[in-house]
Amino acid sequence: MTSKKPTPMMKQWHQCKEQAGESLLLFRMGDFYEAFYDDAVLLSQNLDINLTQRQGIPMSGIPVSTVNGYIDRLVSKGFKVAIAEQIEEAQNNKGKSEPLARELQRFVTPGTLLSSSLLPEKANNYIVSIYRVGSLFGFSCLDFSTGAFLLNEYDNMKDLIDEICRLAPTEILSCDKFYKKHFEIVEQIQQHLKLTLSTYSDWAFEHQFATQKLSSHFNVSSLDGFGLKGLVPAINAAGALLSYLQDKLLLPVEHISVPKTHGNQKHLLIDTASQVNLELLTPIHDPQGKSSLLHVMERTCTPMGGRLLRNTLVNPFYDQKEILLRQDAVEFLLNRSELRKNLRSFLSQVRDLERLTTKITTALAGPKDIGMLRDSLNASMHICEILSPLPLPEFFHGKFTLGLGLASLLELLSKALFGELPLRISDGNIFSDDHHPDLKRLRYTRENSKEWLWQYQDAIRTQTGVKKLKVCYSQVLGYYIEVSSDLAPLLPKDFIRRQSRLHAERFTTEKLQEFQDDMLNVSDKLQTLETQLFKDLCAQILEQRDAILSLSQVIADTDYILSLADLAAEYGYCRPIVDTSDSLSITGGMHPVAQTLLDRGTFIPNDIKMHSARTRMILITGPNMAGKSTYIRQIALLIIMAQMGSFIPARSAHIGMIDKIFTRIGAGDNLSKGMSTFMVEMAETANILHNATDRSLIVLDEVGRGTSTYDGLAIAQSVVEYLLFTEGKKAKTLFATHYKELTDLENHCPHVENFHAGVRENGGHPVFLYEILKGHSQKSFGIHVAKLAGFPLCVISRAQQILRQLEGPETTSKQTQEKVQQLTLF
């Protein structure tokens, strides 16, 4: 930095920069936000804008009118942005030697977006706070754009990481002490998520401070009433998060909801590996592609409905009543196609009620936002009017009276506002003329001043009988009425004399003075009036804030159910029986994603029938590409859909609720952690063995393949035996394997059944049937797969020769067998 004495304006900048810390500071100067020193260099490099100098100080700037787009670009690159505003109008600073007053007013970080193109419409944007006390990890997350505030505690790192990955935050907050001691947590999370790390003071995570912060914000003397008694680490994380937003980032927090415990006792748990392996939200090999379960199920019309669908997909229910309530509601709409069409029409007109309410609460809403709220309430009212008279299933009971209760607010907004509204209050033309008596007069004055003067002149000529009276204007007097001196006595007594001339007299009236005042300040008066009216209207809206948020949840629920009903109607899904039994029976089941990617009717359906008293484990053998992996994933996906309350692609199904789903399906090398593919495989399998229960579903694909044949086989068989015979671990297990030796377990254990992916040979070449059939496979057809993969023909020929030798009775070399089998078990 320069050694010259800073100017008064740069002193302001230094004060703001000290407060901004590591954030990139945008400093308002007239019509631009300027950056100085290192911030200017960063701004120039990352936004491709000019870097200049003033008095040796590097500087660059962006226009106020387009600042939001530039901020989005900075945040998308991982920057935190601090914004210093002018808090004094230029006209109020005339004659003063000091610069305009400025202060740091807000920060923008990835986890605190509100008005941004980066904010995902149908996904939450969470910031997460984590802390540890003793053996417990405290966890709190908040969606600043909706105000949703959740917290929980975990007794192990794995569950904490899984929950954070499930929520997919864009920013994580903790203190230096935690990061130094537990940075492996962040490293593991960063393998799955792109996020920003933020640090806050250690003292903010202390229990006394955190408790006081939360109690003060929610105006309570104790947090016990929120169900938080004894949750010390979670309270510490939540209090620090609230303080970080309010005290560090200077953000409004009035809209933040009462914190809720984010428990998993009534949800089907899906760990991070399974969420990825099953491609619930994002395809593994094509992140922008269409082969995720979310993409297939996504039929929602509203942002709130989309977020609810996404959240339920990774947190299905483990509560029979909740599942049945939604199934009944889906069936109700499924049988009423015209009703679905009408609902879809109105739902598509509903904007993001949650985020609109947040913008109004935080005083960041503009006229267009209020217009979107009005239109959304109008569409929601139609939805309530359509559904409330119908014989609705229990899920919908009592929901649609909420919308009708907002009729008076909708009427107010409809009468108060113009149809088309501007982005900014300063653009004007927000309120209709009838909303306030001064609006019509001021607008008329502004737009029809000359006509008004002619009409007024005619009116007072008629009133006084003085036909030669004139209305004139001068820089000194402003507007005045002039008559010849001999006619002045004819004017009414309420005419106010302004000036006497040699042969004329000049007057004014209260009405003309009012017109003059209006004309001289009409634009300012209009803006001031509409600004105040806008604030008043927002205050009236916020009186109904809770009702609007309740309506938002009703709309989300309706949209969610409609989405599932539309999906079921489009593909002819069946309603599964979901209960507390131990059954897993699906007839004619199809992979919900693969089914949509193939021509209709070409996907081969398959069955499954499991019950702990009979079959707890199915071993599936057969060649690669024959459908084993698709089948085992399919079963897991159908269970997830069923426990969301959705219908599923099958002819019939009876599913006893599953409490946890675990998958061990492939793995990429984790070189940054020094973990090989095999180590990842073993770590994931260990997690399954430790955490599975009798009511879990385990999907295993080729466990043990990453080491020597005998080591792998030994591990695989040991895993199988552990899951079959260990009390509390007797989960339903689907195990796809090339180890034919495992299939012998069927002869020794009544709870194991062998199945295989069907193949028919035609002229020595396999034809994959994509059917899962009883019994084990006789051949792997690995060389055929290598041929399909494009191996040179000489390599294929040599492999066939070696295979014939190995399959012959003369081959007894254990070493040769082990090496070659390892190669063919891909």
Curated annotation (Swiss-Prot):
InterPro entries to which the protein is assigned, alphabetical: DNA_mismatch_repair_MutS, DNA_mismatch_repair_MutS-lik_N, DNA_mismatch_repair_MutS/MSH, DNA_mismatch_repair_MutS_C, DNA_mismatch_repair_MutS_clamp, DNA_mismatch_repair_MutS_core, DNA_mismatch_repair_MutS_N, DNA_mismatch_repair_MutS_sf
Keyword Transferase on entry: no
Keywords: ATP-binding, DNA damage, DNA repair, DNA-binding, Nucleotide-binding
GO biological process: mismatch repair
Protein name: DNA mismatch repair protein MutS
Function: This protein is involved in the repair of mismatches in DNA. It is possible that it carries out the mismatch recognition step. This protein has a weak ATPase activity.
Gene3D superfamilies (alphabetical): 1.10.1420.10, DNA repair protein MutS, domain I, MutS, connector domain, P-loop containing nucleotide triphosphate hydrolases
This protein's encoding gene: mutS
Family indicated by similarity: Belongs to the DNA mismatch repair MutS family.
NCBIfam families: mutS1, PRK05399.1
MF-aspect GO terms: ATP binding; ATP-dependent DNA damage sensor activity; damaged DNA binding; mismatched DNA binding
A single Gene Ontology CC term: cytosol
Keyword Cell inner membrane: no
Organism: Chlamydia caviae (strain ATCC VR-813 / DSM 19441 / 03DC25 / GPIC)
Binding site for ATP: G622, P623, N624, M625, A626, G627, K628, S629
